[in-house]
Amino acid sequence: MKGHFKFLISLFYLIVIAIKSLLLRILLGRSDCKLLTLNYHSIPNDQKANFIWQLKILRKIGEIVPIDFTVKNTKTKRFFKITFDDGFESIINNAVPYLESNNIPYAVFIPTAYMGKVAKWQHYNGKNNPDETIINKNQILKLNKDLAIIGSHSAHHLKFTTIPYDQRLIELKESKEVLEDLLNIEIPFLSIPYGEYDNKLVELARNVGYSKIYSSEPEFTYNNSGNDNFLNGRIGIRPEDSRIRFIIKILGGYNWSSKYFRLKRKIKPVLSKKSERKA
């Protein structure tokens, strides 16, 4: 029921933003470019065909660009970035061959302490996808360097909002340094495990040396504003998403939830203080 309700809200929101875009185009002659970053996890064997279909749709309605791409003056109206959190082996088997044979850029965010090991958290599994192993160092090195960008997903895939400052610092620095030593390049990108963060984490990541970090809050990351934001949202995509749900997601229908997450973060500290006073 919860999923259906969220779907209906997203459908309504998509209609609202479509009307808004139309009015801006008619009244002001304004037509904004939009960039949306997609966030995948596992690509199970039985969902490979669906994943390929999704990529074909993205290429029909827009352009798939690398995560280090910044939109400037262009006639293209929609851009998409493809990211994979966790680095499950299923992406090597079921996603990478198609991506690389079609010259599609993508990014993989690795929790470095689990390279070559079975993931302990497993918050996402496909139907025919048992506990998966994270790709190892050799598999990372074999990825096409012209298409694949490797980023940090912390060291141990912990929930940052539940650990102290010192541990946060270790997680951010260790994963960055391990990947930099392995690839002999700078690692400027971070994907936040579970997508949960606070302002202190954002500032810490900046101080550690990351140039861009990704949450799991759905939103357009670029809209002709000229900003190259440090903190960027992403829309969660599953290869088993129904086709209509996928279309609504990539057109921005689920972006309303980013406003909900921001409001929740603002309210949470206030409620915590009130409960402390009562105690």
Give the ranges of each region predicted by the language model.
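C-terminal active-site subregion of NodB/CE4 polysaccharide deacetylases
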Residues: 2-83, 89-94, 162-169, 173-189, ...
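Histidine-centered catalytic micro-motifs
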Residues: 38, 43, 149-158
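Acidic (Asp/Glu)-rich catalytic clusters
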Residues: 54-63, 97-104, 133-152, 206, ...
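Generic enzyme active-site microenvironment
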Residues: 83-84, 151
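A short, conserved beta-to-alpha structural element at the edge of catalytic cores
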Residues: 103-126
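A short acidic, helix-capping loop that chelates divalent metal ions and anchors anionic groups
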Residues: 117-119, 158-163
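A short acidic, glycine-rich active-site loop
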Residues: 126-134
